[in-house]
Swiss-Prot record:
Reactions accelerated catalytically: phosphoenolpyruvate + UDP-N-acetyl-alpha-D-glucosamine = UDP-N-acetyl-3-O-(1-carboxyvinyl)-alpha-D-glucosamine + phosphate
Single GO cellular component term: cytoplasm
Gene this protein is translated from: murA
Naturally occurring in which organism (per UniProt): Campylobacter jejuni subsp. jejuni serotype O:6 (strain 81116 / NCTC 11828)
List of residues that carry 2-(S-cysteinyl)pyruvic acid O-phosphothioketal: C116
Cysteines joined through disulfide linkages: none
Active site positions, chain numbering: C116
Recorded metabolic or biological pathway in which this protein acts: Cell wall biogenesis; peptidoglycan biosynthesis
Keywords: Cell cycle, Cell division, Cell shape, Cell wall biogenesis/degradation, Cytoplasm, Peptidoglycan synthesis, Pyruvate, Transferase
Keyword Hydrolase attributed: no
Residues that, per the record, bind phosphoenolpyruvate: K22, N23
Protein name listed in UniProt: UDP-N-acetylglucosamine 1-carboxyvinyltransferase
Similarity remark: Belongs to the EPSP synthase family. MurA subfamily.
GO molecular function: UDP-N-acetylglucosamine 1-carboxyvinyltransferase activity
Length: 418
């Protein structure tokens, strides 16, 4: 098993280039199932989740060439509609293949998903929507078995669901007639999926709002154009927090500041200033790091995927911070590990109270999921001594070239084998 050794209390400086968004690239790669032509996608991050999805598509018969952050996908060779457990169990985003496979072939079997261990994240909203479009759905031996010719309908999502929205948008693309989706997720990753499908010839109205109208092609495949994945706002937020927790001046390149409004607002409340250019953000050190109150919510609110990183940052604040996690249960699994480093954090249900300003000490800690693991790295950067972060395969699922990027900023971080 590999682990990271991190020497704390060093200042950071310099520039870091932000990768393409994993959570945008996943549905965009899957959307190639809807294509009649070979699809070229640029700025694809080279992370474990992407490789898992590519192996799933190859398992279904697609031809994929992935190198230098570009993916060339040909799904004309698809000859299989069963997404097997062996691959799907590694990553819950595999469920995204359900809508497009069903829409294209009229039947598919997709194993129930795995991935991060953060709460239930049920797929019932996906299944209810597909049933409303005429699908016959059964759960058999751990697989979603779906069949039927999809027809447009009006669908109201009971809760905002990002993967649910993406799945049904792709299903509606090849369905017969108009689909109206209400209470759709507005995340930038969902918006890019819609824009790419529109550029591929799909008639779609309301992009960027919570109401979409999609005029399905009745099985006719789409003609995709070459495109690039948007920058990863969560990776960007993580590096901003790294600069903040070490109270350093750093610059992020190839980033979209408009996708980070909620994160930047909280950094400003904590006393940090930022300089925003067209595709860069510079974080300036704070005279005093102030406590903050955060409540997670759907975009454009504060992202749940940045909650753990801000909890680490709040440990350096002069006072008591509150984090209210509204989206997922089990999203405080990093707390017990932060306590090992001397953190003062109290949990009451979905609310965490963080008393900042106490010295953090290096420790051996264990990553439990993707974002929690980044919080441990941030805490290690601020702790006195040398920490070891174990089970970093969680990090490799979502952060590209993590230690190289941190080393480029001056962090003392090494990947080692146990």
């Amino acid at each position: 098993m590999t682990y990271l050794e991190i020497e704390g209390t060093n200042h950071l400086s310099g520039n870091v280039t932000i990768s393409g968004a994993k959570n945008a690239a996943l549905p965009l790669i899957v959307s190639s199932i809807l294509a009649k032509n070979e699809v070229k996608i640029n700025n694809v991050p080279n992370v474990a989740d992407i490789k898992t999805l590519i192996s799933l598509l190859e398992n279904l018969g697609a031809k994929v060439n992935f190198q230098n952050n570009s993916a060339l996908l040909n799904t004309n060779t698809l000859n299989q509609t069963i997404a097997k457990y062996d691959i799907v169990r590694k990553m819950r985003a595999s469920i995204l293949t359900l809508g497009p496979l069903l829409a294209r072939f009229g039947h598919c079997e997709v194993s129930l998903p795995g991935g991060c261990a953060i709460g239930q994240r049920p797929i019932d909203l996906h299944l209810l929507a597909l049933e409303k479009m005429g699908a016959n759905i059964q759960i058999k031996q751990g697989y979603v078995v779906a069949s039927g010719n999809l027809k447009g309908n009006e669908i109201l999502f009971d809760k905002i669901t990002v993967t649910g929205s993406e799945n049904i948008i792709m299903a509606a693309a090849l369905a017969k007639g108009k689909t109206k989706l209400l209470n759709v997720a507005k995340e930038p990753e969902v918006v890019q999926l819609c824009e790419v499908l529109k550029d591929a010839g799909l008639e779609i109205k309301g992009i960027g709002t919570d109401e979409l109208e999609i005029y399905g092609t009745d099985g006719e495949l789409l003609e995709f154009k070459e495109f690039s994945v948007i920058p990863d706002r969560i990776e960007a937020g993580t590096y901003l927090c790294a600069g903040a927790i070490t109270n350093s001046k750093i610059t992020l390149d190839k980033v979209n500041a408009t996708h980070l409004s909620a994160v930047l607002a909280k950094l400003h409340q904590m006393g940090f200033e930022t300089l925003i250019a067209e595709d860069s953000i510079t974080l300036l050190p704070a005279k005093e790091i102030k406590p903050v109150e955060i409540m997670t919510s759907e975009y454009p609110g504060f992202p749940t995927d940045m909650q753990a990183q801000f909890m680490a940052l709040a440990l350096k604040a002069n006072g008591t911070s509150i984090i209210d996690e509204r989206l997922f249960e089990n999203r405080f699994m990093h707390v017990s590990e932060l306590l090992r480093m001397g953190a003062d954090i109290k949990l009451n249900g979905h609310i965490a109270t963080i008393v900042g300003g106490k010295e953090l000490n290096a420790a051996d800690v264990m990553a439990t999921d993707l974002r929690a693991s980044s919080a441990l790295i941030l805490a290690a950067l601020a702790a006195k001594g040398t920490s070891k972060v174990h089970r970093i395969y969680h990090l490799d699922r979502g952060y590209e070239n993590l230690e190289e990027k941190f080393k480029g900023l001056g962090a003392k971080i090494t990947r080692l084998e146990e």
